[in-house]
Amino acid sequence: MSVLVNKNSKVIVQGFTGSEGTFHAEQMIAYGTNVVGGITPNKGGQTHLGKPVFNTVADAVKATGADVSIIFVPPAFAADAIMEAAEAGIKVIITITEGIPVSDMVKVAAYIKNRDCRLIGPNCPGVITPEEAKVGIMPGFIFKKGHVGIVSKSGTLTYEAADQIVRQGLGITTAIGIGGDPIIGTTTKEAVELLMNDPETHCIVMIGEIGGQLEPEAARWIKANGNKKPVVSFIAGETAPKGRTMGHAGAIVGGAEDTAEAKKRILRECGVHVVDSPAKIGEKVKEIMSK
């Protein structure tokens, strides 16, 4: 089992013929992801990387039956690309683009609210189900199949956690990079819930950071639902000064509850295994899964 993407996912690339879209589509195809085509307006009818190019998502869905899209569209046009994918019936929309205006994402959130689709991102590394499908920009060779799910706001810390888990002789079911922007399509809690409901996932790693209340919200949900599976967490930004964004637009300490210290306290109170250094994630997972 896996969540969001697997070997049967039919993936299209929006922004297919641009430099980013081309580079990462090549990597995804090489990984074995079932990329069935891509979108670049006014280039429909051409082929690119041996796959058909379409003018619209609707055309691509009609021709290929695509159900997953990955978006490499520039920030000014990315919100329209997300809404176009939702309108065309794409079930999982993974948005890599960073720098989409918050006002645009407010519109997107309202637009997709009652639609049967799930947005991952924006400003995220994507989703990988090892040895089945990589829909994102992560280095696929780090990930091996196993029973640990990862939910993360940070791309690089996702790769670090996966590498440590694999070095401990374990593996990953699905890793979900939810994105570091203030408005994202899938929250930490929602991603954790997907993995809690996946029978193949026996342990979850939750990587968060300062700013917002996504991790405490997830922790309270985990506790309210009986701590069914062990969750290991690391919160980045321990030494961040108040009021300054740290790397991600959403990583800013506003109120007292936004600090790493406050979040870690809440997580521990909810029965989550918190580590104080990212270097300890793999060890902690191994320790818990050996019990």
Predicted regions and their residues:
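Catalytic-core regions of core metabolic enzymes
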Residues: 1-291
